[in-house]
Amino acid sequence: MVEIKTLHCDIETYSSVNLAKCGVYPYVQADDFEILLFAYSTDGSEVKIIDLARGEKIPPVILSAIEDDKVIKYAHNASFERICFSSFLGYPVGKYISPESWRCTMTWAAYMGLPLSLVGVGAVLGLGKQKMMEGKDLIRFFCSLCSPTKANGNRTRNLPSDDPDKWERFKSYNIRDVETEMEIEQKLIKFPVPEFIWDEYHLSERINDRGIKVDMDFVKQAITKDEMSRTKLMGQMQKVTELDNPNSVQQMKGWLSENGVETDTLGKKAVAELLSLIHI
Protein backbone atom coordinates (compact mmCIF):
# COMPACT_ATOMS: atom_id res chain seq x y z
CA MET A 1 0.00 0.00 0.00
CA VAL A 2 1.32 3.45 -0.99
CA GLU A 3 1.76 5.73 2.01
CA ILE A 4 -0.32 8.92 1.80
CA LYS A 5 1.66 12.09 2.45
CA THR A 6 -0.87 14.85 1.72
CA LEU A 7 -4.65 15.05 1.64
CA HIS A 8 -6.62 17.96 0.16
CA CYS A 9 -10.26 17.91 1.19
CA ASP A 10 -13.57 19.73 1.34
CA ILE A 11 -16.91 18.69 2.80
CA GLU A 12 -20.55 19.70 2.49
CA THR A 13 -22.63 19.22 5.61
CA TYR A 14 -26.10 19.53 7.11
CA SER A 15 -27.18 20.69 10.56
CA SER A 16 -30.30 22.38 11.90
CA VAL A 17 -28.02 24.67 13.94
CA ASN A 18 -27.19 27.97 12.22
CA LEU A 19 -23.45 27.86 11.53
CA ALA A 20 -23.03 31.62 11.06
CA LYS A 21 -24.76 32.43 14.35
CA CYS A 22 -23.45 29.60 16.53
CA GLY A 23 -20.07 28.52 15.14
CA VAL A 24 -18.77 25.09 14.22
CA TYR A 25 -18.72 23.51 17.70
CA PRO A 26 -22.49 23.77 18.44
CA TYR A 27 -23.11 23.10 14.74
CA VAL A 28 -21.60 19.60 14.90
CA GLN A 29 -23.25 18.85 18.26
CA ALA A 30 -26.73 18.93 16.70
CA ASP A 31 -28.38 15.51 16.65
CA ASP A 32 -29.07 15.84 12.92
CA PHE A 33 -25.54 16.91 11.93
CA GLU A 34 -24.14 14.89 9.04
CA ILE A 35 -21.50 15.06 6.34
CA LEU A 36 -23.26 14.95 2.97
CA LEU A 37 -20.34 15.03 0.54
CA PHE A 38 -16.60 14.56 0.90
CA ALA A 39 -14.28 15.50 -1.96
CA TYR A 40 -10.59 14.75 -1.63
CA SER A 41 -7.27 14.29 -3.38
CA THR A 42 -4.31 12.29 -2.11
CA ASP A 43 -0.81 13.44 -3.02
CA GLY A 44 -2.07 15.68 -5.83
CA SER A 45 -4.07 12.98 -7.62
CA GLU A 46 -7.41 13.52 -9.38
CA VAL A 47 -10.15 14.66 -7.02
CA LYS A 48 -12.60 11.96 -5.92
CA ILE A 49 -15.95 12.42 -4.21
CA ILE A 50 -17.82 10.31 -1.67
CA ASP A 51 -21.61 10.76 -1.66
CA LEU A 52 -22.33 9.95 1.98
CA ALA A 53 -25.89 11.26 1.75
CA ARG A 54 -26.63 8.44 -0.70
CA GLY A 55 -24.93 5.75 1.32
CA GLU A 56 -21.37 5.76 0.00
CA LYS A 57 -18.59 5.13 2.53
CA ILE A 58 -15.25 6.84 3.04
CA PRO A 59 -12.43 4.33 2.49
CA PRO A 60 -10.78 3.26 5.78
CA VAL A 61 -7.36 4.34 4.48
CA ILE A 62 -8.67 7.90 4.04
CA LEU A 63 -10.28 7.94 7.49
CA SER A 64 -6.95 6.81 8.93
CA ALA A 65 -5.15 9.58 7.03
CA ILE A 66 -7.51 12.18 8.51
CA GLU A 67 -6.42 11.18 12.02
CA ASP A 68 -2.77 10.49 11.18
CA ASP A 69 -0.46 13.36 12.19
CA LYS A 70 2.08 12.19 9.61
CA VAL A 71 -0.37 13.02 6.79
CA ILE A 72 -0.59 16.75 6.04
CA LYS A 73 -4.19 17.83 5.46
CA TYR A 74 -5.12 20.93 3.43
CA ALA A 75 -8.50 22.66 3.49
CA HIS A 76 -9.86 26.20 3.22
CA ASN A 77 -10.90 27.21 6.74
CA ALA A 78 -9.51 23.87 7.85
CA SER A 79 -10.91 24.07 11.37
CA PHE A 80 -14.37 23.38 9.91
CA GLU A 81 -13.30 20.11 8.29
CA ARG A 82 -11.29 19.08 11.35
CA ILE A 83 -14.12 19.64 13.83
CA CYS A 84 -16.73 18.10 11.53
CA PHE A 85 -14.62 14.98 11.07
CA SER A 86 -14.04 14.81 14.82
CA SER A 87 -17.80 14.56 15.30
CA PHE A 88 -18.17 12.17 12.36
CA LEU A 89 -15.54 9.85 13.83
CA GLY A 90 -17.19 9.85 17.25
CA TYR A 91 -14.86 12.09 19.24
CA PRO A 92 -16.57 13.31 22.44
CA VAL A 93 -17.36 16.99 22.93
CA GLY A 94 -14.17 18.75 24.01
CA LYS A 95 -11.92 16.17 22.33
CA TYR A 96 -11.02 16.76 18.70
CA ILE A 97 -8.63 15.58 16.01
CA SER A 98 -5.24 17.17 16.63
CA PRO A 99 -4.71 20.32 14.53
CA GLU A 100 -0.95 19.72 14.22
CA SER A 101 -1.08 18.14 10.74
CA TRP A 102 -3.67 20.52 9.27
CA ARG A 103 -2.79 23.40 6.95
CA CYS A 104 -5.41 26.07 6.26
CA THR A 105 -5.27 27.72 2.83
CA MET A 106 -7.31 30.61 4.26
CA THR A 107 -4.53 31.24 6.77
CA TRP A 108 -2.00 30.97 3.95
CA ALA A 109 -3.98 33.55 1.94
CA ALA A 110 -4.16 35.86 4.96
CA TYR A 111 -0.40 35.60 5.47
CA MET A 112 0.07 36.69 1.84
CA GLY A 113 -2.34 39.61 2.18
CA LEU A 114 -4.88 37.96 -0.14
CA PRO A 115 -8.68 37.84 0.28
CA LEU A 116 -9.85 35.26 2.78
CA SER A 117 -12.68 33.74 0.74
CA LEU A 118 -11.98 30.96 -1.74
CA VAL A 119 -13.65 32.90 -4.53
CA GLY A 120 -11.64 36.03 -3.67
CA VAL A 121 -8.31 34.21 -3.62
CA GLY A 122 -9.15 32.48 -6.89
CA ALA A 123 -9.97 35.76 -8.60
CA VAL A 124 -6.81 37.54 -7.43
CA LEU A 125 -4.55 34.64 -8.37
CA GLY A 126 -6.28 34.15 -11.71
CA LEU A 127 -6.84 30.45 -11.16
CA GLY A 128 -7.86 28.27 -14.06
CA LYS A 129 -10.49 26.52 -11.96
CA GLN A 130 -12.46 29.16 -10.10
CA LYS A 131 -14.97 28.45 -7.35
CA MET A 132 -18.45 27.86 -8.82
CA MET A 133 -20.63 30.90 -8.12
CA GLU A 134 -23.88 28.94 -7.72
CA GLY A 135 -22.48 27.32 -4.59
CA LYS A 136 -24.32 29.60 -2.14
CA ASP A 137 -27.70 28.68 -3.62
CA LEU A 138 -26.85 24.97 -3.54
CA ILE A 139 -25.67 25.19 0.07
CA ARG A 140 -28.83 27.05 1.04
CA PHE A 141 -30.91 24.35 -0.68
CA PHE A 142 -29.26 21.22 0.73
CA CYS A 143 -27.41 22.27 3.89
CA SER A 144 -30.00 24.07 5.99
CA LEU A 145 -33.65 23.91 6.97
CA CYS A 146 -36.23 24.99 4.40
CA SER A 147 -39.69 26.46 4.91
CA PRO A 148 -42.53 23.95 4.49
CA THR A 149 -44.88 24.86 1.63
CA LYS A 150 -47.57 23.12 -0.39
CA ALA A 151 -45.22 23.18 -3.39
CA ASN A 152 -42.50 21.21 -1.57
CA GLY A 153 -44.86 18.83 0.21
CA ASN A 154 -44.43 20.63 3.55
CA ARG A 155 -40.91 19.28 3.99
CA THR A 156 -38.43 21.14 6.18
CA ARG A 157 -35.31 19.78 4.49
CA ASN A 158 -34.25 19.16 0.89
CA LEU A 159 -32.72 15.76 0.14
CA PRO A 160 -30.80 14.65 -2.97
CA SER A 161 -33.93 12.90 -4.22
CA ASP A 162 -35.86 16.17 -4.14
CA ASP A 163 -33.76 17.60 -6.97
CA PRO A 164 -31.29 15.09 -8.47
CA ASP A 165 -29.99 17.59 -11.04
CA LYS A 166 -29.13 20.12 -8.34
CA TRP A 167 -27.48 17.37 -6.33
CA GLU A 168 -25.19 16.47 -9.21
CA ARG A 169 -24.24 20.15 -9.56
CA PHE A 170 -23.62 20.23 -5.82
CA LYS A 171 -21.19 17.33 -6.18
CA SER A 172 -19.42 19.17 -9.00
CA TYR A 173 -19.23 22.24 -6.77
CA ASN A 174 -17.67 20.18 -3.97
CA ILE A 175 -15.06 18.74 -6.34
CA ARG A 176 -14.29 22.19 -7.75
CA ASP A 177 -13.57 23.57 -4.28
CA VAL A 178 -10.83 20.98 -3.77
CA GLU A 179 -9.43 21.68 -7.24
CA THR A 180 -9.36 25.39 -6.41
CA GLU A 181 -7.62 24.74 -3.08
CA MET A 182 -4.99 22.65 -4.85
CA GLU A 183 -4.37 25.41 -7.40
CA ILE A 184 -3.97 27.92 -4.57
CA GLU A 185 -1.29 25.72 -3.03
CA GLN A 186 0.52 25.45 -6.37
CA LYS A 187 0.39 29.23 -6.84
CA LEU A 188 1.68 29.95 -3.34
CA ILE A 189 4.14 27.09 -2.94
CA LYS A 190 7.07 29.43 -3.61
CA PHE A 191 5.87 31.63 -0.75
CA PRO A 192 5.52 29.16 2.14
CA VAL A 193 4.08 30.09 5.49
CA PRO A 194 6.87 30.05 8.12
CA GLU A 195 6.67 27.22 10.60
CA PHE A 196 6.26 29.63 13.51
CA ILE A 197 3.06 30.94 11.88
CA TRP A 198 1.72 27.39 11.60
CA ASP A 199 2.69 26.90 15.25
CA GLU A 200 0.60 29.95 16.13
CA TYR A 201 -2.27 28.64 14.02
CA HIS A 202 -2.18 25.29 15.79
CA LEU A 203 -2.03 27.00 19.18
CA SER A 204 -5.06 29.10 18.22
CA GLU A 205 -6.92 25.94 17.20
CA ARG A 206 -6.10 24.22 20.50
CA ILE A 207 -7.32 27.28 22.41
CA ASN A 208 -10.59 27.23 20.46
CA ASP A 209 -10.95 23.49 21.00
CA ARG A 210 -10.43 23.87 24.74
CA GLY A 211 -13.00 26.64 25.06
CA ILE A 212 -13.79 28.20 28.42
CA LYS A 213 -15.69 26.94 31.42
CA VAL A 214 -19.05 28.61 31.91
CA ASP A 215 -21.32 28.43 34.96
CA MET A 216 -24.54 27.61 33.09
CA ASP A 217 -26.71 27.96 36.21
CA PHE A 218 -25.42 31.51 36.55
CA VAL A 219 -26.02 32.20 32.84
CA LYS A 220 -29.60 30.90 32.98
CA GLN A 221 -30.35 32.95 36.09
CA ALA A 222 -28.87 36.06 34.47
CA ILE A 223 -31.12 35.57 31.43
CA THR A 224 -34.14 35.10 33.70
CA LYS A 225 -33.29 38.26 35.65
CA ASP A 226 -32.87 40.18 32.39
CA GLU A 227 -36.32 39.08 31.22
CA MET A 228 -37.83 40.05 34.57
CA SER A 229 -36.12 43.45 34.45
CA ARG A 230 -37.29 44.10 30.89
CA THR A 231 -40.87 43.21 31.81
CA LYS A 232 -40.79 45.47 34.87
CA LEU A 233 -39.24 48.41 33.01
CA MET A 234 -41.64 48.04 30.09
CA GLY A 235 -44.57 48.17 32.51
CA GLN A 236 -43.19 51.31 34.14
CA MET A 237 -42.64 52.96 30.74
CA GLN A 238 -46.17 52.15 29.63
CA LYS A 239 -47.54 53.60 32.86
CA VAL A 240 -45.57 56.84 32.47
CA THR A 241 -46.07 57.36 28.73
CA GLU A 242 -49.42 55.60 28.18
CA LEU A 243 -47.94 54.29 24.92
CA ASP A 244 -48.87 50.88 23.52
CA ASN A 245 -45.21 50.13 22.81
CA PRO A 246 -42.62 52.37 24.48
CA ASN A 247 -40.00 50.29 22.66
CA SER A 248 -41.13 51.85 19.38
CA VAL A 249 -38.76 54.65 18.37
CA GLN A 250 -41.51 56.47 16.47
CA GLN A 251 -43.97 56.28 19.36
CA MET A 252 -41.37 57.41 21.88
CA LYS A 253 -40.16 60.30 19.70
CA GLY A 254 -43.78 61.40 19.33
CA TRP A 255 -44.34 61.27 23.07
CA LEU A 256 -41.13 63.22 23.74
CA SER A 257 -42.15 65.84 21.18
CA GLU A 258 -45.54 66.24 22.86
CA ASN A 259 -43.65 66.85 26.09
CA GLY A 260 -41.31 69.47 24.64
CA VAL A 261 -38.30 67.31 23.83
CA GLU A 262 -37.18 67.11 20.18
CA THR A 263 -34.66 64.54 18.97
CA ASP A 264 -33.80 62.93 15.65
CA THR A 265 -32.56 59.72 17.20
CA LEU A 266 -32.88 57.60 20.30
CA GLY A 267 -29.47 56.02 20.05
CA LYS A 268 -27.52 55.33 23.23
CA LYS A 269 -25.38 58.46 22.90
CA ALA A 270 -28.35 60.70 22.14
CA VAL A 271 -30.35 59.35 25.09
CA ALA A 272 -27.40 59.92 27.44
CA GLU A 273 -27.17 63.55 26.25
CA LEU A 274 -30.92 64.05 26.71
CA LEU A 275 -30.79 62.68 30.23
CA SER A 276 -27.98 65.09 31.09
CA LEU A 277 -30.11 68.03 29.93
CA ILE A 278 -33.55 67.16 31.24
CA HIS A 279 -35.17 65.35 34.12
CA ILE A 280 -38.19 63.15 33.43
Regions found by a protein language model. Give the residues of each.
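Active-site-proximal helix-loop-helix substrate-binding element of RNase H-like nuclease domains
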Residues: F33-I35, Y40, G44-V61, A65-I189
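Short secondary-structure capping/turn segments at boundaries of alpha-helices and beta-strands
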Residues: G23-Y27, V61-I62, G267
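Short secondary-structure boundary/capping segments
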Residues: K21-P26, L89-P92, E262
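A short alpha/beta connector and helix-capping loop motif
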Residues: L19-L36
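Conserved "right-hand" nucleotidyltransferase catalytic core of DNA-directed polymerases
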Residues: M1-T13, V17-L19, L37-A39, D137-I278
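Sterically constrained small-residue positions within well-ordered secondary structures
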Residues: V2, Q29-D31, Y96
